[in-house]
């Protein structure tokens, strides 16, 4: 599908791949869990926490819309000091001097995902991501054959 990596930004690639009959097992789509996931917050500044929460909203909106993905499993509920400085949890370090186990903005995003509160809770993330509609985060994924056809069309257009 023309990409060396699968990220939340191009998650449609994985969705299209898993729904390709060539990847099926006994004629059925394989189960696909995104496990041990969560965006990181660099630190506990408000900007970093909002960025993490917006990243989580982005990821969850993708998962929600892509039918090939069966589940999203958060990496950890709390930041863990033994993970090399990563802060991928939905709550702060247990020994944080200001707010031990404090709920990060990402906690509220995860809590309200797929509930009637989702739209309201996720609204802040659009500004952070620089979009006006969640539709803007989705991309059409072309398989290799489609990409080759586009290249041929583009090459022909050069001569026309």
Where do the PLM segments sit?
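Aromatic-rich peripheral "rim/lid" segments of glycoside hydrolase catalytic domains that contact
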Residues: 41-160
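Noncatalytic carbohydrate-binding groove/subsite architecture in carbohydrate-active enzymes
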Residues: 1-46
